Amino acid sequence: MHTTGDGLVVPENEQAYRSVVDRAGHGYLLRQIFVARAGHCTFTPAETITALHVRLNRLDTGHWNVPSPADLNAEAASLGALNVAPPAFTSYRPAPYLRPFDLPGEGRFLFG
């Protein structure tokens, strides 16, 4: 889970991470969820619990069933007092990671 307006650890890192996971052949294990908010890890408690439910469902069923942002927002909203701000799950595709990064153990640089 990542905020779209994170200036400390930019969301483009998620695109770089996906590239590494995909090249390792494990893309089927990775799901990325984004929250439309500024700041680093500025998730509400309700958003955090909702994302945890998605992960727990994956462990229980062996399958990813990531609901739409609207469904995630509805689940978070149902948690009442844990919403210190309106739920803000969103569809988001990070921009390409423009800096080369090294894939550990392979001694080569990758570009997103």
What are the residue ranges of the model-derived segments?
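C-terminal His-loop and adjacent cap/lid subdomain of alpha/beta-hydrolase
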Residues: M1-G112
